[in-house]
Amino acid sequence: MAKYEPKKGDYAGGAVKILDMFENGQLGYPEVTLKLAGEEANARRAGDERTKEAIHAIVKMISDAMKPYRNKGSGFQSQPIPGEVIAQVTSNPEYQQAKAFLASPATQVRNIEREEVLSKGAKKLAQAMAS
């Protein structure tokens, strides 16, 4: 979601910001997974398979950890995530590895550069179509 991306096209950075909010208990469930799924979809659309896979793995971890706590029949109403679930997810080595990948400057720079190239291409196409 553009709202969470430090720079346009930085879907990994947006996911890291959402994960920081998750770790601080600022987002409930399923809100956190829905926001992450948005970043995952944007990464997939942009062709960034590694970022998409890292975000998808985290979404699955959070969803699996929340299974015993889900309110049945509450639809998409957000519910607080228990501290033990946050601790369980954040202590998982796969979570730590995925978040480190997403937070790495190399990942974020690659995403921003790709978005800039795509934006320039779109501008050139629009100019060509206008003339």
UniProtKB/Swiss-Prot annotation:
It holds the Pfam family RIP_P131-like. GO terms for cellular component: virion component. It is found in: Virion. Keywords: Virion. Belongs to the viral ORF131/RIP family. This is Structural protein ORF131.
